[in-house]
């Protein structure tokens, strides 16, 4: 409710200021820092208030988890006081050295006083019981009431059970009541979009100054550039790159200093001379003789390489087994004899049927001439 009242008060004042600014006003001057200067001081104050930097105050950083735990936490029913000092056990192992200490003497005195007080209290209770038995009933009732009051006073020292447990519905209602009021269109119009971020930073404590560190510029990587590669300086021309070549396997070819046009012309003339000399060859010319002699030599060398003798291959110079050479010569002669004998008529006599080619042909002719004669009979003969 308080928040609503404050907002209504501010809204009323803002409405009045807007009404004042709507009418015609006298302007005395302009400036880059302050802007327009009005003659009326109240209007000038309203204008400066609008030009002031906007601030969006942010709520404190509250830990809502801890807040929720504290809300739904159950406290202990009783808190028992711990003894100041635990009694020392009588058993001590190892080397025992008695040291006179003031604390031990104080403990003995405290224990003696406590024992005396307990004995006195017990004696009082016993005497009271004995005396109450002697007293009349009315007096005994009054004494019992007094004893009950004393017991209740002693029990007041104990902490009562204080459960701070809240239902989910109550907690939800409380959170809704603590929520701020929703923003209106008027609130959005007061803070422009371009000033929203700066207003939030001012609410967090920003003083409006930029940091001393230089901003990091994110440069986009060039296309088709591999990982770890560096782009070539675009300022250097191709000629500047070739002046200072790096030590690499590739060696650029430098152009000749002479004029390329003259060189090409000289080459053309030389080629033309050669072509003319080849066309004008005659059997009597020396060039023709040289060419023919070279051709004959090359032809003879090719023929001799195809038909080399056994001795020309230098097989006899090698250390070979003489029996192997004899065996090779014997079989070579036998193959030659076989080639000459296979075309004679007596070569296939006495061999198997697979070699009787000539007899097979003759049998075919006999079948045509004498059909009554069987082909198998001729085969078996």
From Swiss-Prot:
Pfam families: G-patch_2. The modification Phosphoserine is found at residues 11, 13, 275, 277. Residues 287-297, 306-332, 362-375 have a biased composition (Basic and acidic residues). It is found in: Nucleus. Residues 104-157 form a coiled coil. Keywords: Coiled coil, mRNA processing, mRNA splicing, Nucleus, Phosphoprotein, Spliceosome. InterPro entries: Spp2-like, Spp2/MOS2_G-patch. Belongs to the 40S cdc5-associated complex (or cwf complex), a spliceosome sub-complex reminiscent of a late-stage spliceosome composed of the U2, U5 and U6 snRNAs and at least brr2, cdc5, cwf2/prp3, cwf3/syf1, cwf4/syf3, cwf5/ecm2, spp42/cwf6, cwf7/spf27, cwf8, cwf9, cwf10, cwf11, cwf12, prp45/cwf13, cwf14, cwf15, cwf16, cwf17, cwf18, cwf19, cwf20, cwf21, cwf22, cwf23, cwf24, cwf25, cwf26, cyp7/cwf27, cwf28, cwf29/ist3, lea1, msl1, prp5/cwf1, prp10, prp12/sap130, prp17, prp22, sap61, sap62, sap114, sap145, slu7, smb1, smd1, smd3, smf1, smg1 and syf2. Involved in spliceosome maturation and the first step of pre-mRNA splicing. PANTHER family: G PATCH AND KOW-CONTAINING, G-PATCH DOMAIN AND KOW MOTIFS-CONTAINING PROTEIN. This is Pre-mRNA-splicing factor cwf28. It comes from Schizosaccharomyces pombe (strain 972 / ATCC 24843) (Fission yeast).
């Amino acid at each position: 409710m308080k928040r609503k009242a404050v907002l209504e008060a501010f809204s009323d004042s803002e409405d009045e200021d807007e009404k004042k600014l709507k009418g015609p006003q006298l302007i005395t001057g302009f400036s880059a820092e302050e802007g327009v200067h009005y003659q009326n001081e109240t209007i000038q104050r309203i204008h400066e208030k609008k030009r002031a930097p906007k601030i969006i105050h942010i709520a404190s950083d509250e830990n809502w988890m801890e807040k929720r735990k504290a809300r739904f936490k159950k406290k202990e029913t009783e808190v028992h006081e711990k003894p100041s000092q635990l009694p020392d056990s009588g058993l001590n192992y190892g080397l025992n050295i008695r040291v006179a200490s003031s604390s031990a003497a104080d403990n003995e005195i405290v224990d003696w006083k406590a024992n005396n007080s307990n004995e006195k209290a017990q004696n009082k209770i016993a005497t009271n019981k004995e005396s109450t038995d002697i007293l009349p009933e009315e007096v005994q009732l009054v004494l019992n009431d007094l004893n009950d009051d004393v017991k209740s006073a002693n029990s007041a020292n104990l902490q009562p059970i204080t459960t701070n447990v809240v239902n989910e519905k109550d907690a939800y209602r409380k959170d809704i009541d603590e929520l701020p009021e929703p923003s209106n269109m008027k609130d959005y119009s007061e803070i422009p979009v371009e000033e929203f971020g700066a207003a939030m930073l001012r609410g967090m404590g920003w003083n409006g100054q930029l940091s001393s560190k230089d901003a990091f510029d994110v440069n986009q990587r060039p296309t088709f550039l591999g990982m770890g590669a560096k782009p070539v300086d675009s300022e250097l021309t191709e000629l500047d790159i070739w002046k200072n070549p790096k030590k690499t396997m590739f060696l650029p070819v430098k152009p000749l200093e002479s004029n390329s046009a003259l060189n090409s012309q000289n080459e053309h003339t030389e080629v033309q001379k050669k072509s003319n000399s080849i066309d004008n060859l005659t059997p009597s010319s020396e060039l023709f003789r040289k060419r023919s002699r070279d051709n004959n030599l090359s032809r003879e060398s090719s023929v001799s390489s195809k038909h080399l003798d056994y001795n020309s291959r230098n097989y006899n110079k090698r250390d070979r087994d003489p029996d192997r050479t004899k065996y090779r010569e014997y079989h070579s002669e036998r193959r030659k004899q076989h080639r000459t004998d296979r075309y004679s008529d007596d070569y296939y006599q006495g061999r198997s049927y697979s070699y009787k080619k000539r007899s097979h042909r003759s049998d075919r002719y006999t079948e045509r001439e004498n059909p009554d004669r069987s082909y198998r009979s001729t085969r078996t003969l």
